[in-house]
């Protein structure tokens, strides 16, 4: 009964139900088993990791396990004298889903810190799918498995505008599919998640507020007897007033659960508990390949793809694949051109909110990440991590072709294109292609003329922030890069690289026409004009043209009477 049917997708082995329940089913006297013992807890990150088939399988298995534990008469692990048919399960007494059974059976429901909406909805479903061991309402004879639902129903008889429930015999999986795919919940300001949607509002009832019928499209619906609850600041509709209160918390920040370490606010206590793991030393998931530990199972799974090379999320537009779903979602905005996040300072827009937040630091000058070795600070955390490898010498990313290693994975990806010749970034204006997205972005500014970085001293503008930084050293006189051969200093590293060729004699740029080589690419470009006859620099006074800008400047001195 606990096994997974042939052909059905498998849950990750760490998340499968424990074997204690199977033992208890074979020999009930061997020990009491509770639903907590076999239930599986998912954090929000872990839940997002599952695909739709696995989510449906999870609900199937949990519902089946719930029915079995209920039939054994050992629901929540709290000892009392009631018979199974008299046991009450309060809507507020929802057990914890755990991967570890430690302490789960000794805690009563009132001390439970994690209250998951998923289980509550599973219990609602169990009530409506024919479980006949619940409580009986003497007023009208209707039976309920959950005492909270009994209390809500009793309000009908005292005219308290109760929440009502109407169901048919549609399967739980059908309900999942309908409400995940049709997405009947709308909100302009709040990002809805799947677990909040497990209230199972009928599509028609959401739109009209009318009582849903026994359509096979909806397994269970809960809503107010008169109309849905709405809040003036948000268009989202709710079937339960407690969900509305939670939604109001998101917008007003009232009654939130706040982390004492960092001040982050959560709308649910269970979310706060999950968040607090970030601050704790608890890292229960260890990678067998490299020994790295992780706080969340989802982070562990994603990390393993570094070793396996698995990239399960493919872009339907270009076929490019990714190891994480959010990376795919971010990538798809490249095709759609969607850039919804705009900077209020300069108007620049971004496809991701995190990119906008990082960009804002250009204007504010904030650099919150500081190196403990040299005191250098950075605006982004990953920049600090990369910088620290300068001190440690760590170069973990190695090329399989030539053995060259790199401190950044992105550098390795770019390097591999030297071997493959791949140039995936093509300009739609001129057709020129590039190996790196940064080079492509820089090139596009040639066509747009965009120069967003302005010098505060002289007003000169630049297309790149790095160019502005180098330029500002003209005003400050800073020359932080020094030659180890002759102690000559330079304002930027690129100038040092060019200078070092004076000492090494390296001349990497060779003319394909005559074989002459040069130490700088600009010198090769000027030399090629000898073969092509191109003279792009023209004198405005006499119309004479030149192949080199410096020669034009010298020529112009003839007109102004200045001696060259």
From Swiss-Prot:
GO cellular component: a single term: nucleus
Annotated spans, Disordered: 85-108
Keyword Metal-binding included in the entry's annotation: yes
GO molecular function: DNA-binding transcription factor activity, RNA polymerase II-specific; RNA polymerase II cis-regulatory region sequence-specific DNA binding; zinc ion binding
Organism the protein comes from: Homo sapiens (Human)
PANTHER family in alphabetical order: FINGER PUTATIVE TRANSCRIPTION FACTOR FAMILY-RELATED, ZINC FINGER PROTEIN 502
Name assigned to this protein: Zinc finger protein 211
Family named by the database record: Belongs to the krueppel C2H2-type zinc-finger protein family.
Annotated S-S bridges: none
Record bears the keyword Repeat: yes
One Pfam family per UniProt: zf-C2H2_6
Main location: nucleus
UniProt cross-references to CDD domains, sorted A to Z: KRAB_A-box
InterPro entries listed in its UniProt record: C2H2-ZF_domain, KRAB, KRAB_dom_sf, Znf_C2H2_sf, Znf_C2H2_type
Biological process according to GO: regulation of transcription by RNA polymerase II
Keyword terms of this UniProt record: DNA-binding, Metal-binding, Nucleus, Repeat, Transcription, Transcription regulation, Zinc, Zinc-finger
């Amino acid at each position: 009964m606990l096994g997974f049917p042939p052909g059905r997708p498998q849950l990750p082995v760490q998340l499968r139900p424990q074997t204690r329940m199977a033992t208890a089913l074979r020999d009930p006297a061997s020990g009491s088993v509770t639903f907590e013992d076999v239930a599986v807890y998912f954090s929000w990150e872990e839940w997002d990791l599952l695909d739709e088939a696995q989510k449906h399988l999870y609900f199937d298995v949990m519902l089946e396990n719930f029915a079995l534990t209920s039939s054994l008469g050992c629901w929540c692990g709290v000892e009392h004298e009631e018979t199974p048919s008299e046991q009450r399960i309060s809507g507020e007494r929802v057990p914890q889903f755990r991967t570890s059974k430690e302490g789960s059976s000794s805690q009563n429901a009132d001390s439970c810190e994690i209250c998951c909406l998923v289980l509550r909805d599973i219990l609602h479903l169990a009530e409506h799918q024919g479980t006949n061991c619940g409580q009986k309402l003497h007023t009208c004879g209707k039976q309920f498995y959950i005492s909270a639902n009994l209390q809500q129903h009793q309000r009908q008889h005292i005219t308290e505008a109760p929440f009502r429930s109407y169901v048919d015999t549609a399967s739980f999986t059908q309900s999942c599919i309908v409400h995940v795919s049709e997405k009947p919940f709308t909100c302009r300001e709040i990002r809805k998640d799947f677990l909040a949607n497990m209230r199972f509002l009928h599509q028609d009832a959401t739109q009209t507020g009318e009582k849903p019928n026994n359509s096979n499209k909806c397994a269970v619906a809960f809503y107010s007897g008169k109309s849905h609850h709405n809040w003036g600041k948000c268009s989202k509709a709710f079937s339960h007033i407690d969900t509305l209160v939670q939604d109001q918390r998101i917008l007003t920040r009232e009654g939130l659960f706040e982390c004492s370490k960092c001040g982050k606010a959560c709308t649910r206590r269970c979310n706060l508990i999950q968040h607090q793991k970030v601050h704790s030393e608890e890292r229960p998931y260890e990678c067998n390949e490299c020994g790295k530990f992780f706080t969340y199972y989802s982070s562990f799974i994603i990390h393993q793809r570094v070793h396996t090379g698995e990239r399960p999320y493919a872009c339907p537009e270009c076929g490019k694949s990714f190891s994480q779903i959010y990376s795919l979602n971010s990538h798809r905005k490249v095709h759609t051109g969607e850039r919804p996040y705009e900077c209020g300072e300069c108007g620049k827009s971004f496809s991701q909110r995190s990119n906008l937040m990082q960009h804002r630091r250009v204007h504010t000058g904030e650099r919150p990440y500081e190196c403990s070795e040299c005191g250098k600070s950075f605006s982004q955390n990953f920049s600090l991590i990369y910088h620290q490898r300068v001190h440690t010498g760590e170069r973990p990313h190695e090329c399989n072709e030539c053995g060259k290693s790199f401190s950044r994975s992105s550098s390795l990806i770019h390097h591999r294109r030297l071997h493959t010749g791949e140039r995936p970034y093509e300009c739609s204006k001129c057709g020129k292609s590039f190996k790196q997205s940064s080079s492509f972005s820089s090139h596009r500014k040639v066509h747009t003329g965009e120069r967003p970085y302005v010098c505060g001293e002289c007003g000169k503008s630049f297309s790149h922030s790095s160019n502005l930084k180098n330029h500002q050293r003209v005003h400050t006189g800073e020359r932080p890069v020094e030659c180890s051969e002759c102690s000559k200093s330079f304002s930027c590293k690129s100038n040092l690289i060019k200078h070092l060729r004076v000492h090494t004699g390296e001349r990497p740029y060779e003319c394909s026409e005559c074989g002459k080589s040069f130490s700088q690419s600009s010198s090769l470009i000027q030399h090629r004009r000898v073969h092509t006859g191109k003279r792009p620099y023209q004198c405005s006074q006499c119309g004479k043209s030149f192949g080199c800008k410096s020669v034009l400047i010298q020529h112009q001195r003839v007109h102004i009477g200045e001696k060259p």
